[in-house]
């Protein structure tokens, strides 16, 4: 009873019905007030007998007790209509849910399959997998078959597994990672040709260059931007190749000092004379018989032992 009165719309309908019924009994002037009084008694949980007693005490003995019977019949009809509307709404929601679920399943079953990356036809979709997706039913059996086909497609031990496709994303991520290098504490005054830390741009004036980014500049030591804030190689790094070095020389400073490899292809500092290995100079070899004494042209002295 209380739930019905608290439901929006039903309490107003019951109030209007009570007011019309009281007007039929000849209490039209006080019908609105009596309807409010009846709703208060209903909200307090009064029974049919208790409502009759209250109205008889309020109106008098001429009160028609059939009103209470009509009142509870009206309440019963409103409750039935309310339950019917709730059931219809729940059925509509259930139908919408079932339709949505079936639509999602159909979309999943007819989804576009992944293409296989192959050297001979990189832009041609996998027609076999497309045919499998379209021929699979939408029931439980179809879902099991679809799951089985997906497992076979991504099974590394299967013959049709595309190894290059699974490896390429990881390699691509490794190549796209930015190289971060810490800043050299000597900045543009660094004298190490093989310094691995970041330095200011060589185009800036001495002491004015700044490194505000942990990325290395693509131009390297050839950077011409005075306001470049990326990292650069050491100012002592040799970037121009000596004339006697071949064009196949690798433009990276050699880590060995001095370098003793005559075929070394790395760059060596210009101030070092060990650009290429040279054998030590051969000195004139003299025999022991041709060696001279410490004092040349000295007279021989005879020492006679004393007796």
Curated annotation (Swiss-Prot):
Protein purpose: RNA-binding protein involved in RNA processing. Acts as a regulator of mRNA stability: binds to mRNAs and pre-mRNAs, preventing their degradation. Involved in the biogenesis of circular RNAs (circRNAs) which are produced by back-splicing circularization of pre-mRNAs.
A Gene Ontology molecular function term of the record: poly(A) binding
InterPro entries linked to this entry: Nab2/ZC3H14 (IPR040366), Nab2/ZC3H14_N_sf (IPR043094), Nab2_Znf4 (IPR049017)
Residue ranges of the region described as Disordered: 102-135, 274-307
Skewed-composition ranges (Polar residues): 105-129
Zinc finger map (C3H1-type): 178-202, 217-232, 254-268
Subcellular location, record wording: Nucleus
Family named by the database record: Belongs to the ZC3H14 family.
Protein name (record): Nuclear polyadenylated RNA-binding protein nab2
Top-level division of the source organism's lineage: Eukaryota
GO biological process annotation, one example: regulation of mRNA stability
Record-level GO cellular component terms: cytoplasm; nuclear envelope; nucleus
Entry keyword set: Metal-binding, Nucleus, Repeat, Zinc, Zinc-finger
């Amino acid at each position: 009873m209380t739930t019905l009165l608290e439901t929006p719309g039903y309490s107003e309908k019951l109030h209007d019905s009570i007011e019309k019924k009281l007007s039929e009994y000849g209490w039209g002037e006080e019908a609105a007030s009596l309807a409010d009084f009846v709703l208060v008694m209903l909200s307090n949980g009064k029974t049919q007998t208790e409502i009759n007693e209250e109205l008889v005490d309020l109106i008098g003995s001429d009160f028609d007790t059939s009103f209470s019977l009509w009142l509870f019949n009206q309440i019963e009809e409103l409750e039935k209509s309310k339950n019917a509307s709730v059931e219809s709404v729940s059925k509509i929601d259930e139908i919408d849910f079932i339709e949505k679920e079936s639509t999602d399943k159909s979309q999943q079953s007819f989804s576009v399959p992944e293409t296989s990356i192959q050297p001979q036809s990189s832009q041609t979709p996998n027609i076999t997998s497309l045919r499998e997706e379209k021929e699979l039913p939408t029931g439980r059996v179809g879902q099991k078959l679809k799951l089985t086909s997906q497992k076979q497609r991504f099974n590394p031990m299967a013959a049709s597994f595309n190894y290059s496709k699974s490896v390429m994303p990881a390699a691509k991520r490794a190549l796209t990672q930015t190289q971060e290098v810490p800043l050299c504490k000597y900045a543009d005054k660094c004298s190490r040709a093989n310094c691995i830390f970041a330095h200011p741009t060589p185009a800036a004036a001495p002491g004015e260059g700044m490194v505000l980014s942990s990325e290395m500049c693509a131009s390297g030591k050839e950077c011409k931007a005075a306001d470049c804030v990326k990292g650069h190689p050491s100012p002592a790094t040799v970037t121009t190749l000596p004339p006697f070095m071949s064009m196949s020389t690798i433009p990276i400073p050699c880590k060995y000092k001095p370098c003793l490899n005559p075929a070394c292809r790395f760059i060596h500092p210009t101030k070092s004379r060990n650009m290429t290995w040279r054998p030590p100079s051969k000195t004139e070899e003299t025999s022991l018989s041709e060696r001279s004494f410490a004092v040349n042209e000295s007279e021989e002295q005879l020492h006679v032992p004393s007796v």
